[in-house]
Amino acid sequence: TYREETEMLYQSRLSYLGQLTGNHFLDEKKLHSLAWNMGYSYAYRIEPDRRIVVNQAGMSDGVDVSQLKVGNESIKRYFQSLSDHVFSGSVDYKGTVPMGEILSTVKGGLISEYRTRNYTPREFIYRYENLSLEERASYLYLPYEEMMSEDWLSVDKVFIDEITDKKNAYEAYNIYGAGYGAMELPMGKFNVYAGLRL
């Protein structure tokens, strides 16, 4: 038995990434500074019409593959789209704080990210159970372009049946946040660094 599968598809992708950043001094002596960052990214992929054709054949009287009579066993069409959105932001503070005769450095910051994803698939198959034996014998050996033509599509002939498994589709989101604070103290020839992360 001879069997092969042919796929014809078009795939489109789009991606975008953008950022805005800033650095600011909060005083004239430039002892305190603030840095911030805002970002957005987008990714999108679509397959608007993937066509999957399965061909089969039984062995002929000879053993030469060229003698095989090949027919189309099934035709499926698959549509899918996937989109991602990511929003992010962060802010960092750094300042010099006098503690008696010691100048300590204080740092702190926050970061957050929000991500969403949406995946939508749809799957269809061409059903030919309504065809008579003679019509089916003719239909299955047509070029696949003709099998999908409107001449064959009707309620009492070939019809398109949706076989989408809804469990494969999903929507998801994720929120992430973190922060930190730290202090650096010079102690003679050494620096003492202490901090906390959340």
What are these regions (language model features)?
Residues 1, 5-49, 73-123, 159-191:
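Outer-membrane beta-barrel transmembrane strands
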Residues 57:
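Predominantly extracellular beta-rich ligand-binding scaffolds that present long acidic/polar faces
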Residues 61-75, 120-171:
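Flexible glycine-rich, low-complexity coil/linker segments exposed to the extracellular/periplasmic environment
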Residues 138-140, 189-192:
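Intrinsic disorder/low-structure terminal segments
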Residues 196-198:
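Short, small-residue-rich loop/turn micro-motifs
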